[in-house]
UniProtKB/Swiss-Prot annotation:
Places the protein is found: Nucleus; Nucleus speckle; Nucleus, Cajal body
Family from the record: Belongs to the ELL/occludin family.
Chain intervals with Polar residues compositional bias: 332-341
Modified residues annotated as Phosphoserine in this record: S300, S542
Any Gene Ontology biological process: positive regulation of transcription elongation by RNA polymerase II
GO cellular component, one term: Cajal body
Described purpose of this protein according to its UniProt entry: Elongation factor component of the super elongation complex (SEC), a complex required to increase the catalytic rate of RNA polymerase II transcription by suppressing transient pausing by the polymerase at multiple sites along the DNA. Specifically required for stimulating the elongation step of RNA polymerase II- and III-dependent snRNA gene transcription. ELL also plays an early role before its assembly into in the SEC complex by stabilizing RNA polymerase II recruitment/initiation and entry into the pause site. Required to stabilize the pre-initiation complex and early elongation.
GO molecular function, one term: phosphatase binding
Pro residues bias: start-end ranges: 454-470
Region (Disordered): 292-489
Protein name: RNA polymerase II elongation factor ELL
Biased composition (Low complexity): 403-416
PANTHER family for this protein: OCCLUDIN AND RNA POLYMERASE II ELONGATION FACTOR ELL, RNA POLYMERASE II ELONGATION FACTOR ELL
Length: 602
């Protein structure tokens, strides 16, 4: 197969294999012995009468490959079938076939989407190769170790005579002391050797527990790691039985993961740990011990196992947020959604933090030049960890948002509403109104739509006026005032957390409504994305030009089209904002509880 060249275009076809054809595409993972058997057959397939075959039996099966040296015999390799979408949440792949046409051109053909994976199981040859690799690693370790000469050898009994040096002149300055040179390498070895010797004196079970607590190990890797500190033959013989008691073995890759019940036996001041290892263990203990005993835990190792904690941290070392999985990002979004309790939520340290809006809405995106950060989908291990880049971060981020607002010039653009267009006044780009006008506008909103008087048109010479059929900037569901006397139901239903069972219950409620929140937010964002693009184009054009009027008319046309196809937008937006505030409240309570547990941990 010819390699694809850079800076060259190739044709990609998807029609060679029709939907009705019986072609299935799999991702196949072979062992070394299976790959050698395939290559041997490919090299001598003309001299072999038999043909390879594959047989599926449910989620398992076997592959038969003829042997060129024994034409009448075949080698059988068993395999198991797994779903890529379930095992790896990153998604599936497409199978692309490269072929050369009759004219000599290179083409690419998409055979289909790879949804299943075939993993060939290891055979005796694979285990034999693993044993040889392990023996070779032990031999290399033994060759680097020191040779101890026992007393009573062949050199015993020989005497060595030392001659005394001739008396020389005495030092003219008796009080002078000569500095003894220091060997830096030997000093480092002594300091590191003291920690290793203290680890060797500890029980073998504790040594294995504290190694598996940091990350999963294969048995061969664990043996090599234990040999660095010192390993006796008796401890080596008991390793298999010990792993069965304290670890869970993954049958796919053979990695050993420490069982959750064993984390209570760990010591944070283990002598073999570095400062980064202690920070990592502290986070792991917080995550494991905060979960209730009857909660279902994942058998896969936590993601912190793969890396050690950095000594320099942006947050103080006494607070490590177990839910934070991303760096905090400051939002430049200035207008907020409907406030809860006067727009504030209590922070863990006593300050009040401003709750960001749930996502881009028509009024937000059309009246601001900045989009709020887009909410990202949750990760598979914990949906609470990645609700939004605007939720669950430290109080300093929220204080920074309150202290440094970024007002931008706004532009009057249409917004989806539920009441007739004929009753809405003409609107232009709005400026920040005075308090009297703002309170009057809120009073008008509390009336039914048919009783509202036309709103006065603000003076803004920098933006065009929309035609009479366009609604105002503030729709029925845009910024409904929330009375400070009415406490939201979630504040009464979800008080502060006092136990791990209550934490798990809050987390379950969060997960139950988070999918609905994501769906609503995605629909709202899809509606507003087009208006945001047109708004950016309109800001770059000069008022009164042909391009300006064309873009402005396109905005109105897009608005009318979206209003016809999305009649329930106002209700969905209201529901999305409510879920945003509710989920943010639950997440904040969980973060406060975890912080209290972490500070109380000795």
């Amino acid at each position: 197969m010819a390699a694809l060249k850079e800076a060259r275009s190739y044709g990609l076809s998807c029609g060679r294999v029709s939907d009705g054809s019986r072609v299935s595409v799999f991702h196949v993972k072979l062992t070394d012995s299976a790959l050698k058997a395939f290559e041997s057959y490919r090299a001598h397939q003309d001299s072999v009468s038999l043909r390879p075959s594959i047989r599926f039996e449910g989620s398992q099966g076997h592959i038969s490959i003829p042997q060129p040296d024994c034409p009448e015999e075949v080698r059988a390799f068993s395999f198991y079938l797994s779903n890529i979408g379930r095992d790896s949440p990153q998604g599936s792949f497409d199978c692309i076939q490269q072929y050369v046409s009759s004219y000599g051109d290179v083409h690419l053909d998409c055979l289909g989407s790879i949804q299943d994976k075939v993993t060939v199981c290891a055979t005796d040859d694979s285990y034999q190769k693993a044993r040889q690799s392990m023996a070779q690693a032990e031999e290399e370790t033994r060759s680097r170790s020191a040779i101890v000469i026992k007393a009573g050898g062949r050199y015993m009994g020989k005497k060595v005579q030392f001659r005394k040096p001739a008396p020389g002149a005495a030092d003219a300055v008796p009080s002078r002391k000569r500095a003894t040179p220091i060997n830096l390498a030997s000093a480092i070895r002594k300091s590191s050797g003291s920690g290793a010797s203290s680890v060797v004196q500890r029980p073998f079970r504790d040594r294995v527990l504290h190694l598996l607590a940091l990350r999963p190990y294969r048995k061969a890797e664990l043996l090599l790691r234990l040999q660095k500190d010192g390993l006796t033959q008796a401890d080596k013989d008991t390793l298999d039985s010990l792993l069965q008691q304290v670890a869970s073995v993954n049958p796919k890759d053979g990695t050993c993961t420490l069982q959750d019940c064993m984390y209570k036996s760990l010591q944070k001041d283990w002598p073999g740990y570095s400062e980064g290892d202690r920070q990592l263990l502290k986070r792991m203990l917080m995550r494991k011990l905060c979960q209730p005993q009857n909660a279902t835990t994942d058998s896969s190792p936590p993601r912190e196992h793969g890396r050690s904690a950095s000594p320099s941290q942006k947050r103080p070392t006494d607070f490590i947020d177990p839910l934070a999985s991303k760096k905090p990002r400051i939002s430049h979004f200035t207008q907020r959604a409907q406030p809860t309790l006067n727009g504030k939520l209590g922070a863990p340290n006593g300050h009040e933090t401003l709750l960001p809006a749930p996502g881009p809405t028509p009024s937000d995106t059309l009246s601001s030049s900045h989009l709020p950060p887009r909410l990202e989908p949750p990760r598979t291990h914990d949906p609470l960890a990645d609700v939004s880049n605007d939720l669950g971060h430290s109080t300093q981020d929220y204080k920074h948002q309150e202290a440094t607002p970024a007002p931008a010039p706004h532009l009057g653009l249409p917004l989806l509403t539920d009441f007739p267009q004929a009753e809405q006044p003409t609107s232009s780009s709005h400026t920040h109104s005075r308090p009297k006008k703002k309170s009057k506008k809120h009073k008008d909103k509390e009336r039914p739509p048919e009783e509202r008087p036309p709103a006065p048109q603000p003076d803004a010479p920098t933006a065009p006026a929309l035609p009479p059929d366009a609604p105002g900037l503030n729709g029925a569901c845009d910024n409904e005032p929330t009375s400070s006397s009415e406490t939201p139901d979630y504040l009464l239903k979800y008080p502060a957390i006092s136990s791990s069972e209550q934490r798990q219950s809050y987390k379950n409620d969060f997960n139950a409504e988070y999918s609905e929140y994501r769906s609503l937010h995605a629909r709202i964002e899809q509606i507003t994305r087009r208006f945001t693009q047109l708004d950016a184009q309109l800001r770059q054009l000069s008022q009164g030009s042909d391009e300006y009027e064309t873009t402005r008319g396109q905005i109105l046309q897009e608005y009318r089209k979206i209003k016809k196809t999305n009649t329930n937008y106002s209700c969905e937006k209201r529901r999305c904002e409510y879920l945003h505030r509710k989920l943010a409240h639950i997440k904040r309570l969980i973060a406060e509880y975890d912080q209290r547990q972490l500070q109380a941990w000795p």
